Amino acid sequence: MSEFLPFSRPAMGVEELAAVKEVLESGWITTGPKNHALEQAFCQLTGNQHAIAVSSATAGMHITLMALEIGKGDEVITPSLTWVSTLNMISLQGATPVMVDVDRDTLMVTPEAIESAITPRTKAIIPVHYAGAPADINAIRAIGERYGIAVIEDAAHAVGTYYKGRHIGAKGTAIFSFHAIKNITCAEGGLIVTDNENIARQLRMLKFHGLGVDAYDRQTWGRAPQAEVLTPGYKYNLTDINAAIALTQLAKLEHLNTRRREIAQQYQQALAALPFQPLSLPAWPHVHAWHLFIIRVDEQRCGISRDALMEALKERGIGTGLHFRAAHTQKYYRERFPSLSLPNTEWNSERICSLPLFPDMTTADADRVITALQQLAGQ
């Protein structure tokens, strides 16, 4: 059998090794100048005013909710079709996640679903830019402004995603991920951008023990001796080892995403003749980052279930992913919200399958996936 083709593989090279070597030889391996450079680079990429690097996007979500003073008695609107960490962070703050349905074919929340879920207790809205495509963020942000509700963009899939000519995170508050499967990675890491100076100040304190300064003060080359804890905080800072890798990856972003786009186009052309349904593209002007390529496997239409397809591909040496099992079907949330029904979310959660997609894939790799899908579709 051919070598196993994973669902994802990070695109690392000699440049990343050199970046890590430089940090190790510098003598400063934790939060330092590489973090500052990464934050500046993301301000330049997005056009936003402030950037705060953190140890993960989950950590970023946690302290963003804290900075917005979201807690007991508050409600936060979010899709159920998202990684469960968002729901977990809302719940750990003592707030209530209000899960709404998604569009059946883009798998993103709609402004209409969000607005219908607003109550006097709604404190925040968390739309997800899903799979590398942008949600209709102008319309969602307008709802937030109309009701006085904060919008936190889950941009974990959206490094390199553009909406109506502007990079995701150009204004407001957005959270990016550098997890191992993301479009740029440093193994683990995340970053928040915001145009709110007060939120930025709170985030910098909360990510590092509640201190009023960073781990690395860029003026005095070391933390000032008079630094004080201004509020209880966490240990969510990003090391310079990770930041250096992320910076190197960011310099390659256009190349990495171009290759993702080429593979996605190869899949799209082949799937036109197959019963497996890819996601629809958003109607608004955008640039897709192609973080994921997802098909829906409906047994009645395809002659095979999603789970059986994934197992059959595995037997052929091809890895797949599931993004995501609906959060409200997980045990904890199923028991907490037993009557919640989200038809589009549930239909997709039972059928979605993420195909291999990463920059180092070859055309032959994609052809191998396509051939397997053709065989499993009986063609």
UniProtKB/Swiss-Prot annotation:
Catalysed reaction equations from the record: UDP-4-amino-4-deoxy-beta-L-arabinose + 2-oxoglutarate = UDP-beta-L-threo-pentopyranos-4-ulose + L-glutamate
A molecular function GO annotation: pyridoxal phosphate binding
Cofactor(s) for this UniProt protein: pyridoxal 5'-phosphate
One CC-aspect GO term: membrane
Entry keyword Metal-binding: no
Pfam families linked: DegT_DnrJ_EryC1
Pathway it works in: Nucleotide-sugar biosynthesis; UDP-4-deoxy-4-formamido-beta-L-arabinose biosynthesis; UDP-4-deoxy-4-formamido-beta-L-arabinose from UDP-alpha-D-glucuronate: step 2/3; Bacterial outer membrane biogenesis; lipopolysaccharide biosynthesis
Keyword Translocase in record: no
Location of N6-(pyridoxal phosphate)lysine modifications: K182
Record EC number: 2.6.1.87
One annotated GO biological process: response to antibiotic
Domain of life of the native organism: Bacteria
Cystine pairings recorded for this chain: none
InterPro entries hit by this protein: ArnB_NH2Trfase, DegT/StrS_aminotransferase, PyrdxlP-dep_Trfase, PyrdxlP-dep_Trfase_major, PyrdxlP-dep_Trfase_small
Keywords assigned: Aminotransferase, Antibiotic resistance, Lipid A biosynthesis, Lipid biosynthesis, Lipid metabolism, Lipopolysaccharide biosynthesis, Pyridoxal phosphate, Transferase
Function: Catalyzes the conversion of UDP-4-keto-arabinose (UDP-Ara4O) to UDP-4-amino-4-deoxy-L-arabinose (UDP-L-Ara4N). The modified arabinose is attached to lipid A and is required for resistance to polymyxin and cationic antimicrobial peptides.
Similarity-based family: Belongs to the DegT/DnrJ/EryC1 family. ArnB subfamily.
Record note on quaternary structure: Homodimer.
Entry-linked PANTHER family: TRANSAMINASE, UDP-4-AMINO-4-DEOXY-L-ARABINOSE--OXOGLUTARATE AMINOTRANSFERASE
Name of the protein described by the UniProt record: UDP-4-amino-4-deoxy-L-arabinose--oxoglutarate aminotransferase
Gene field: arnB
